[in-house]
C-alpha cells in the first residue's frame, strides 16, 4: 500500500509540473529570448515559451515546495553555477527562438501504455536542440546527478549550446534518478532515447548511425555501461547500435 501511495504522489507531482506547459501550449503564447545569467528562476519559469517548450527547469528534490523562495528568487547563475551560466542562458534563448519558430522541443520516450505499466517512465524525455548541419551526426547529452539532484540545465542545456555553435544537433536526456533508478532504469532510458532518435532520424534531420554520447559524472558512468559490449548492461542488451564516439566528463567509476 505504501508503495502505491508513493507512486500515486509521484504521478500527481509530475502532472502538476506539466500543467503550466500545457496551458502555454494551448494558448499559443510566446515569450522573449531575453534570459541572462542574472535572470531570476521565477521569471525563466514563467516565460511562456519556456513553459510551452516543456524543458524541465527544476533539480528534483532540490526544489522542495517548502523552500519556494529559493527557486523563485535564485538567479540562473546561482542555480546552475558561474561556470555554465552564460552558455545555459544562451541555450535557453536558442530554445525559446526554436520554439517560437514552431520547433517541438520535448519528446516523451515511452508510450502511455508503457508509462501506465511503470509510472516513473513519465519523467524520461529528450529535449531537441537542432544544429546548423542538416543530415549531420547527433549528440546525446547526459548530465550527472547527485542521487536526487539532476542537471538538465547546468550540464545539458549549456553543453547543447556549445555543440550547437559547432553545428551539431543535440538531444538532452532527462532520465530517472534516485529511488526511481531501480532495475537499471537509467540504462533503459538511454537506450530508449537512442532508439527514438534513430527511428525518427529523418524527422530530426540527423544521421541514424555513428552518433555520439557526451555525459558527465554519474551520467558518464551510465553512458560508459551503455556503450560497453556487456550482454546484460550494454547497448546490445537493448538492441540498439553502439555510439560512434563516447565523451565522458569526470565519470563516476
Model regions: which residues?
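Bacterial N-terminal signal peptides
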Residues: 9-18
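Sec-dependent signal peptide cleavage junction
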Residues: 19-26
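N-terminal cap/lid segment of alpha/beta-hydrolase-fold proteins
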Residues: 59-61, 65-134, 183
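Short beta-strand element of the alpha/beta-hydrolase
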Residues: 136-145
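Short beta-to-alpha linker loops that shape the active-site pocket of alpha/beta-hydrolase fold enzymes
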Residues: 145, 169, 174-178, 252
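Catalytic nucleophile-loop/oxyanion-hole region of alpha/beta-hydrolase
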Residues: 151-155, 173-208
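Short amphipathic alpha-helix adjacent to the substrate-entry channel of hydrolases
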Residues: 153-171
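Primarily recognizes the serine-hydrolase "nucleophile elbow" in alpha/beta-hydrolase
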Residues: 192-253
Amino acid at each position: 500500500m505504501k508503495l502505491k501511495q508513493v507512486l500515486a504522489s509521484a504521478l500527481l507531482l509530475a502532472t502538476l509540473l506539466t500543467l503550466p506547459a500545457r496551458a502555454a501550449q494551448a494558448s499559443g503564447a510566446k515569450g522573449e529570448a531575453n534570459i541572462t545569467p542574472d535572470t531570476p528562476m521565477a521569471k525563466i519559469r514563467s516565460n511562456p515559451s519556456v513553459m510551452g517548450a516543456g524543458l524541465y527547469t527544476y533539480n528534483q528534490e532540490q526544489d522542495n515546495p517548502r523552500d519556494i523562495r529559493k527557486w523563485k528568487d535564485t538567479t540562473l547563475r546561482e542555480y546552475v553555477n558561474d561556470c555554465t551560466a552564460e552558455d545555459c542562458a544562451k541555450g535557453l534563448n536558442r530554445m525559446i527562438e526554436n520554439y517560437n519558430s514552431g520547433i517541438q522541443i520535448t519528446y516523451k520516450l515511452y508510450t502511455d501504455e508503457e508509462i501506465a505499466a511503470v509510472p516513473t517512465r513519465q519523467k524520461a524525455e529528450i529535449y531537441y536542440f537542432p544544429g546548423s548541419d542538416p543530415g549531420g551526426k547527433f549528440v546525446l547529452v547526459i548530465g550527472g546527478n547527485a542521487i536526487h539532484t539532476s542537471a538538465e540545465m547546468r550540464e545539458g542545456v549549456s553543453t547543447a549550446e556549445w555543440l550547437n555553435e559547432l553545428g551539431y544537433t543535440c538531444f538532452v536526456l532527462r532520465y530517472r534518478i534516485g529511488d526511481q533508478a531501480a532495475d537499471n532504469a537509467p540504462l533503459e532510458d538511454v537506450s530508449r532515447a537512442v532508439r527514438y532518435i534513430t527511428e525518427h532520424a529523418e524527422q530530426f534531420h540527423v544521421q541514424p548511425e555513428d552518433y555520439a554520447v557526451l555525459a558527465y559524472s554519474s551520467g558518464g558512468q551510465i553512458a560508459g555501461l551503455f556503450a560497453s559490449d556487456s550482454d546484460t548492461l550494454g547497448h546490445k542488451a537493448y538492441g540498439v547500435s553502439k555510439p560512434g564516439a563516447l565523451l565522458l566528463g569526470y565519470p563516476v567509476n
